[in-house]
């Protein structure tokens, strides 16, 4: 089962909710899951200020400074769920495909032009929609629900805010299946 997330660079607090989950799944279900992180991007600039002179300089970010590197560490448990060889290749930040990556526990998908963004949904079976409880997130749209539905993907969503509008939990309290459910809703801990 391929479990994927796609989004932008402003979702660190949302993705931190997933911390520890890839490792627990990969330990208990070895070879049955793949986590797919879509949108990996190393573009960006950093502006630095010299404290003594007040002069500002702007430079390209280094790969390890990218928020996507932090996202990847969440999805790979700091590269523990992948082989050392694959982890080293990932941390070399080479664009392109790694041989056999479709069968590995984690897969990085580089950013694509906005006109082909939706094609990323073809790379996974289950869409993740974690969302941090915060007033800003409470009033967001349910875009992830709409995208998953449009692409006929199963959805695991946070039981919060915008996802409570259209999502009906497919599993009731106690584990009973809800035949009217359209999503797996997960409580924030």
Name every feature range the model reports, one short phrase each.
Residues 1-3, 33-34, 126, 154:
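Charged active-site motifs of nucleotide-sugar-dependent glycosyltransferases
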Residues 1-13, 19-23, 35-36:
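Conserved donor-binding/catalytic core segment of Leloir-type glycosyltransferases
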Residues 10, 140, 184:
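Glycosyltransferase donor-binding loop in the core domain
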Residues 25-32, 98-101:
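Short helix-capping segments at alpha-helix termini
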Residues 39-123:
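Nucleotide-activated donor-binding/catalytic signature segment of Leloir-type glycosyltransferases, i.e.
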Residues 110-120, 125-149, 156-166:
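Nucleotide-sugar-dependent
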């Amino acid at each position: 089962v391929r479990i994927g997330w796609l989004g932008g660079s402003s979702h660190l607090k949302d993705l931190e909710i997933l911390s520890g989950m890839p490792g627990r799944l990969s330990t208990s279900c070895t070879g049955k899951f793949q986590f797919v992180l879509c949108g990996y991007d190393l573009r960006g600039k950093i502006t630095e200020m010299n404290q003594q002179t007040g002069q500002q300089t702007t430079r390209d970010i280094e790969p390890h400074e990218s928020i996507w590197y932090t996202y990847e560490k969440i999805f790979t448990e700091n590269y523990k769920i992948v082989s050392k060889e694959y982890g080293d290749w990932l941390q070399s930040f080479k664009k392109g495909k790694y041989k056999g990556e479709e069968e590995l526990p984690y897969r990085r998908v580089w950013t694509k032009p906005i006109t082909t963004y939706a094609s990323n949904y073809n790379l996974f079976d289950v869409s993740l929609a974690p969302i941090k409880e915060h007033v800003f997130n409470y009033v967001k749209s349910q875009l992830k629900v709409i995208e998953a539905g449009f692409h006929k993907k199963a959805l695991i969503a946070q039981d919060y805010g915008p996802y409570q509008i259209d999502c009906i939990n497919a599993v009731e309290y106690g584990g009973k299946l809800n035949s009217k459910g359209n999503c797996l809703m997960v409580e924030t801990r």
